[in-house]
Regions:
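Flexible, substrate/cofactor-facing loop regions flanked by secondary structure
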Residues: 112-182
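Acyl-donor-binding surface of acyltransferase catalytic domains
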Residues: 49-126, 244-248
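N-terminal charged segments
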Residues: 1-67, 79-80, 155
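Conserved active-site alpha-helix within GNAT-family acetyltransferase domains
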Residues: 79-93, 200, 224-242
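Conserved beta-hairpin
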Residues: 21-25, 82-93, 155-173
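Conserved GNAT acetyl-CoA-binding A-motif
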Residues: 65-76, 210-223
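Conserved beta-strand in the GNAT
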Residues: 25-32, 95-99, 168-177, 181-188, ...
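Conserved acetyl-CoA-binding loop-helix of GNAT-fold acetyltransferases
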Residues: 53-61, 186-191, 195-212, 234
């Protein structure tokens, strides 16, 4: 089953990019003390479908005690639904991520040379420019730690960068490959160049490259509550499931 393969891939990748994988009673702690500002690399992945919200909060407090945030990752959508309301009521941010696979041609054609693969230096510069513009007030240290995170994906998922336009990128995205699957991630367009079709060109270039190399499925994760999922549908992606993330910032601070 496609969704099961994607869940398996996500689990292996999550463990492949962190400093430490530590079993907990109701899941697995994914820890990267060397990059404490990168929430994505410091979380508790819940694996017990019977675990309740109070128990999981206590476990996250223990597992992530040295960090300024708390994060739960839940691949089981049914469990995510059950946890969403009680966790939201106690101040947790609830993020439902749609799993979308490319299963048809895009609705609109994009010029063949509008987007293409670029070298790591170009991709890194484009992502850094996008991240600095985000409304969360990321400090430069967080931008640097996110760049270090990208290097981990280079190793664990043979990550590559795609951009549009190629010479002076307005949009950059990343392509991960493992186990015959491909994931498009970190899609970002600088504010001054939005609405010009660069994101479509970059994403389609990455998706086409993955498909040409035999990857199946080609998929991405996107926030169910935000508009991009509608745009991804126009690029030929369809929803097949969802995963959940829960985030709490007890100490406040900038979003990495």
């Amino acid at each position: 089953m496609t969704l099961g393969r994607i869940h398996g891939y996500l689990g292996r990748l999550e463990e492949g990019v962190v400093d430490e994988v530590r079993p907990e009673r109701h899941g697995v702690a994914l820890l990267t003390p060397s990059l404490p500002l990168v929430w994505q690399l410091n979380a508790l992945r819940v694996e017990d479908p019977a675990a309740g919200p109070v128990t999981l909060v206590e476990e996250a407090d223990r597992a992530l005690a040295d960090l300024g945030h708390r994060k739960l990752v839940v691949h089981d959508a049914d469990l995510g639904v059950r946890l969403a309301r009680p966790l939201a009521a106690t101040g947790w941010n609830v993020l439902r991520l749609l799993v979308m696979v490319r299963d048809r041609p895009p609705e609109r054609a994009v010029a063949r040379d509008a987007g293409a693969e670029v070298d790591r230096r170009t991709g890194a510069a484009g992502l850094a420019a996008f991240r600095r513009e985000q409304p969360f007030g990321w400090p430069e240290e967080a931008v640097d730690q996110l760049a270090a995170m990208d290097e981990r994906y280079d190793r664990a998922a043979l990550a590559r960068d795609f951009a549009s336009p190629v010479r002076e990128p307005a949009c950059v995205c990343r392509l991960y490959r493992a186990d015959g699957l491909a994931q498009i991630d970190e899609v970002g367009t600088v504010e001054a160049r939005r609405g010009e079709g660069h994101a479509s060109a970059a994403v389609l270039a990455a998706a086409d490259a993955a498909a040409a190399e035999g990857c199946d499925p080609v998929f991405l994760l996107t926030d169910a509550s935000d508009w991009p999922h509608k745009w991804y549908r126009t690029l030929g992606f369809s929803e097949i499931g969802s995963v959940y993330e829960f985030l709490k910032l007890p100490l406040g601070g900038a979003r990495p």
